[in-house]
Amino acid sequence: LYRDCQSLVEAIQKILFYNGLLWQVGHRHVGLGRMDLVLYPYYKKDVEANRLNYEQAKGLLKEMCLLLGKDSPMKSLNLIGDSGQYIILGGVDKNGKNTDNELTRMFLELFEELRIPDPKLIFRVNEETPMDTWKRSIRCLANGCGSPLFMNETLIMENMVKFGYRNEDVWNVGTSACWEPLIIGKSSDQNNPFISILACNALKKALTEMEDELDYGGLLQLVKRNLAEETRSVVVDKDYDYSPIMSLFNESCIRSGKDFAHQGSDYMYQGAQLLGLPNLVNSLLNIKKYVYEQGLVSLGICREIVQTDYENHLDIKQLFKSANDKKFGLCDEYVLRLSQELIGTVSETIGKLTANGYNVKFGLSSPSYISRGKVASATLDGRNAGEPFAVHISPLSSTIDIAEVLDFASSLSYPVNCLNGNVVDYVIP
């Protein structure tokens, strides 16, 4: 611990030692950083000195990954494997050059073989990512382990600079927990310190407030107003404890002489998360079609459904769930516009707020889609009370294929402050 590592095995041991120490002092979601970039010099030195070959190095990484995942149930929060133990692969260095190397491929091979859910891989990709590495990543993902997640680093880094991160720092983008971007070694960003912004609360409140003669445009404006109020209610200043051990690993803290959680880092942006956007969009699409355009359902029935969980209205539940040909995830002009307007409402509201003196970012992904769903009432997209909300930027309909979902996600315009994780999840049977 008192000197630089002299070999790959020493580097791995040091990482495991400090990783264990961080968990023991109460830190959770301890990310592992850019392991292929960090470990490669030690691997290269060992190979050149004939101390190690490819398979032996792969064996060392295997033991490291198995050890990290051994206590996954204890480390996990909402779901088993939700430990935040992410290994980041690929991406560019500070000179803009791709860092893919033998360890990048080694990690991908290893996870393809082990099929473990924890730790996980994040693969930073760009236009120069080698095709061979892409193919290895797809093979790894296809085995069902959930790794790697793909990070569109070019777009993310551009938006980080626009938001306030320095251009010379964003090459070293990492993640806090699962997908929320930050700068490794210079950030103390808290990317999910607030309860999630529950999008469907805006419609539920609107239904209780509105008059039945209000037209759809008026309802939509009321929903937007309530969504802004919901957003303002969750963004608050937080009282953080001191963290001497974490401060030792933050170069900004060492330079400033201040604690990690008390203005020692170069960046301390707080992050909010929008939960259930697909549910709200589909609910509004159903109201537009079946209440205002076709007159099949009244607003009174909609209120009753939310209050009674579709009691005596199973036919309407099926109608709302399956019949509408316009759904979140489809590249339909109005679906995209409605989604964009709701995202814009949150963005505009967040843009006027601060937390602990710093600007706030938000994302369209939230890990609480199960826990918040358990205590939420029914929604007008066919979801029963207690059921999970939609996962991130993902369709609720199995008829929308992955290509269309990706087209939809790429067709959205993400505001500069919509930077706290925008994940497309898709389950392939």
Please describe what each predicted stretch is.
Residues 1-429:
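Conserved catalytic cores of very large enzyme subunits
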